[in-house]
Amino acid sequence: SEMIVDEGDPFSKLLVNKSINNLKGRNIFGNVEHKILPGSSEDLKVIEITVEEKATGEIMAGAGIGTDGTSFSFAVKENNWLGRGVKLQSEVNVTEHKISGNISVNNPNYNYSGNSVFVALDVSSTDRSGTTGFSSSKTGFSLGTSFEQYENVFFSPRIDVAFEDIEVDSAASDQIKKMEGNFFNTDFSYGITVDKRDQVFKPTAGYRATFFQTLPIIQDSSSILNGLDMSTYHDFSEDLIGSFKFFAKSIHGIDEDVRLSNRLFIPSKKLRGFSTYR
């Protein structure tokens, strides 16, 4: 599905370059080269593609010290599981206040349809009894897909199911004590993406904008999440590519306050040098 051009299509150098770029973006080949050769007649071309295999598995381990204290992480990733281009990833993160782990499987070309299908399992345990006076444990399951609805317009629906247990200390504030209990959620989330980048792999021009929303289907403490993520790219010179990125999220409780674990904070990868949860 990464090849935009097919046998018998009118020749387009632009579409050939996009196809090669898509192959590089899959991150399962060490090198991808192509040649455009003359065909049996003047109006025919032969495209010869040469790929170099590489190890598609990755193991990552890390440790750090920052404004949130000490953190450790370990991840295993496979970009070509079973030789079918399926992405398999598992990750464990440990900080002073939270332990989280997840495993996800993403088939970017499910049943040769060109549509992506993914499934994920997330488990986390948070202990903030020494600061805000609560601790929580959460187990969640996600199932979703992503496909190109119109040219350069992608739709990504998903279903999230989660169970969470929140315990509150007796010394916590009255506002936090109201959040104690067991919660079961079933949410419907979707994203609409407009992708006008010149290429998926190392873009040099264009933009990518995504609007995403989460709506409660079955939820003990209902809230609606809205977000916008935008990236633009511009090539100032052959060796200098500039980018501008905008990210915003908001969450609104429907009938009561937003649950403690659902409240929003700026991700550390978006704003560095500050303590999270502040």
Which residues are covered by each model-predicted region?
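Charged catalytic cores and adjacent phosphate/nucleic-acid-binding surfaces used
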Residues: M230, F246
